[in-house]
Amino acid sequence: MNPMIFIILLGTIMLGTSIVMTSSHWFLTWLGFEMNMMAVIPVLMKKYSPRSMEAATKYFLTQATASMILMLAIIINLMFSGQWTITNMDNFTASMLLTTALVMKLGLAPFHFWVPEVTQGVSLNSGLILLTWQKIAPLSLLYQIYPSINTNLLLIMSLLSIMIGGWGGLNQTQLRKIMAYSSIAHMGWMMAIMIYNPNLSLLNLFIYILMTSSMFMLLIFASTTSMLSLSLTWNKTPIITIMSLMVLLSLGGLPPLTGFMPKWMIIQELTKNNSVILPTLMAILALLNLFFYMRLTYSSALTMFPTMNNTKLTWQYQNTNILPMMMPLITMSTLALPLTPLFILLN
């Protein structure tokens, strides 16, 4: 792809997300989603292959369906309220349709099936955009309309997402699919707290983007997409392998790493709101995620003895300079837990 065209597409993606975040008019919000979707599809197909074409087609069909449901919700709301203001969503049917459209765009259960397939079919750079930046626009709209969202529906979807994000990753060895199921589980945690404390949901989003970006940067730097190839990086870059495994454990929420912070704060906030069963179930289901992350870390670091015979490796490692943001991102992704009291105070 021409670098100039790629820059224009990235600018359009950011512009579409910015329109959704700053708009108070329903039509402009829908327009921002459409701009974002049409610009990200060529980015997904940047490295042309049948697999990337299939992934882009699945993404287009899912997002187009969600946009259609979103427009239907907007029209129904307009019929009953006569206003285009975003915060005015009093109709039950419109609220349910809007919630369905947004969780479909986010990839929450039971509309999660496209996330692992699309992520596995695209390059690491495209997967980074798909699992980080593309979550901002739907979550920003949910943040604006959270008082009118059906609480029970959102909590059921969040629990399903945490459960499926854990179960789905148990038998995976492909890192992109592991990151996709991790995304589904993290979205479930964000939705669970959205009703009670939307600011905490935004903090969770920030930490999730931080950890996911760190992991993808490490994978891009090491040119690896599977656990086997990641474990073989011991021969070339042992520091990269160690940092990758640390970020994986942080994504699983293992204390004392950064990933434990949002889970700690969310469980504390739910308990303050006299909710005991929900955080208990969420904590139990989160053990599924932690289990497969620890199993992957164990198999990669302790059971595969490093070999010095580099001729056995199908190595695509490129001697490029470490990205300038990589080390600060990794540090924040693993060692930011002591900042938790500060975030609790600000919250």
UniProtKB/Swiss-Prot annotation:
<dbReference type="InterPro" id="IPR003917">
    <property type="entry name" value="NADH_UbQ_OxRdtase_chain2"/>
</dbReference>
<feature type="transmembrane region" description="Helical">
    <location>
        <begin position="326"/>
        <end position="346"/>
    </location>
</feature>
<keyword id="KW-1133">Transmembrane helix</keyword>
<protein>
    <recommendedName>
        <fullName>NADH-ubiquinone oxidoreductase chain 2</fullName>
        <ecNumber>7.1.1.2</ecNumber>
    </recommendedName>
</protein>
<feature type="transmembrane region" description="Helical">
    <location>
        <begin position="25"/>
        <end position="45"/>
    </location>
</feature>
<keyword id="KW-0496">Mitochondrion</keyword>
<feature type="transmembrane region" description="Helical">
    <location>
        <begin position="202"/>
        <end position="222"/>
    </location>
</feature>
<feature type="transmembrane region" description="Helical">
    <location>
        <begin position="239"/>
        <end position="259"/>
    </location>
</feature>
<keyword id="KW-0679">Respiratory chain</keyword>
<dbReference type="Pfam" id="PF06444">
    <property type="entry name" value="NADH_dehy_S2_C"/>
</dbReference>
<comment type="similarity">
    <text>Belongs to the complex I subunit 2 family.</text>
</comment>
<feature type="transmembrane region" description="Helical">
    <location>
        <begin position="149"/>
        <end position="169"/>
    </location>
</feature>
<feature type="transmembrane region" description="Helical">
    <location>
        <begin position="274"/>
        <end position="294"/>
    </location>
</feature>
<dbReference type="InterPro" id="IPR001750">
    <property type="entry name" value="ND/Mrp_TM"/>
</dbReference>
<dbReference type="InterPro" id="IPR050175">
    <property type="entry name" value="Complex_I_Subunit_2"/>
</dbReference>
<feature type="transmembrane region" description="Helical">
    <location>
        <begin position="1"/>
        <end position="21"/>
    </location>
</feature>
<keyword id="KW-0999">Mitochondrion inner membrane</keyword>
<feature type="transmembrane region" description="Helical">
    <location>
        <begin position="178"/>
        <end position="198"/>
    </location>
</feature>
<dbReference type="GO" id="GO:0005743">
    <property type="term" value="C:mitochondrial inner membrane"/>
</dbReference>
<keyword id="KW-0812">Transmembrane</keyword>
<keyword id="KW-1278">Translocase</keyword>
<dbReference type="Pfam" id="PF00361">
    <property type="entry name" value="Proton_antipo_M"/>
</dbReference>
<keyword id="KW-0472">Membrane</keyword>
<keyword id="KW-0813">Transport</keyword>
<comment type="function">
    <text>Core subunit of the mitochondrial membrane respiratory chain NADH dehydrogenase (Complex I) that is believed to belong to the minimal assembly required for catalysis. Complex I functions in the transfer of electrons from NADH to the respiratory chain. The immediate electron acceptor for the enzyme is believed to be ubiquinone.</text>
</comment>
<dbReference type="GO" id="GO:0006120">
    <property type="term" value="P:mitochondrial electron transport, NADH to ubiquinone"/>
</dbReference>
<feature type="transmembrane region" description="Helical">
    <location>
        <begin position="96"/>
        <end position="116"/>
    </location>
</feature>
<dbReference type="GO" id="GO:0008137">
    <property type="term" value="F:NADH dehydrogenase (ubiquinone) activity"/>
</dbReference>
<dbReference type="InterPro" id="IPR010933">
    <property type="entry name" value="NADH_DH_su2_C"/>
</dbReference>
<keyword id="KW-0249">Electron transport</keyword>
<keyword id="KW-0830">Ubiquinone</keyword>
<feature type="transmembrane region" description="Helical">
    <location>
        <begin position="127"/>
        <end position="147"/>
    </location>
</feature>
<keyword id="KW-0520">NAD</keyword>
<feature type="transmembrane region" description="Helical">
    <location>
        <begin position="60"/>
        <end position="80"/>
    </location>
</feature>
<comment type="subunit">
    <text>Core subunit of respiratory chain NADH dehydrogenase (Complex I) which is composed of 45 different subunits. Interacts with TMEM242.</text>
</comment>
